[in-house]
Amino acid sequence: MNTDQQKVSEIFQSSKEKLQGDAKVVSDAFKKMASQDKDGKTTDADESEKHNYQEQYNKLKGAGHKKE
């Protein structure tokens, strides 16, 4: 593999790792929001609220994949 290809491969791998880290942060944030009410107290959110957060997460996740 020549040096240009190696550099591109290293940049791609670095970007991929960063995106995976960003996706985990977003996923964790949506999970946290789904489990809290407006006062920040843990609550048993009904399924429709949880579904809404999951739907938003899926849209964001899908938008990230479209850029590749």
UniProtKB/Swiss-Prot annotation:
Tell me where on the tree of life, at the top rank, the source sits: Eukaryota
Q: Where is this region: Inhibitory domain?
A: 1-32
Entry-linked InterPro entries: IA3_dom_sf, Pai3
Spell out the Basic and acidic residues composition-biased ranges. Answer: 33-53
- Locate the N-acetylmethionine modifications and list their residues: 1
Per UniProt, the keywords (alphabetical) are: Acetylation, Aspartic protease inhibitor, Protease inhibitor
Q: What's a GO biological-process term for it?
A: negative regulation of endopeptidase activity
Sorted alphabetically, the Gene Ontology cellular component annotations on this record are: cytoplasm; nucleus; protein-containing complex; vacuole
Molecular function as annotated in GO: aspartic-type endopeptidase inhibitor activity; endopeptidase inhibitor activity; protease binding
Q: Which family does it belong to?
A: Belongs to the protease inhibitor I34 family.
Q: Write the protein's name.
A: Protease A inhibitor 3
Task: List the source organism.
Answer: Saccharomyces cerevisiae (strain ATCC 204508 / S288c) (Baker's yeast)
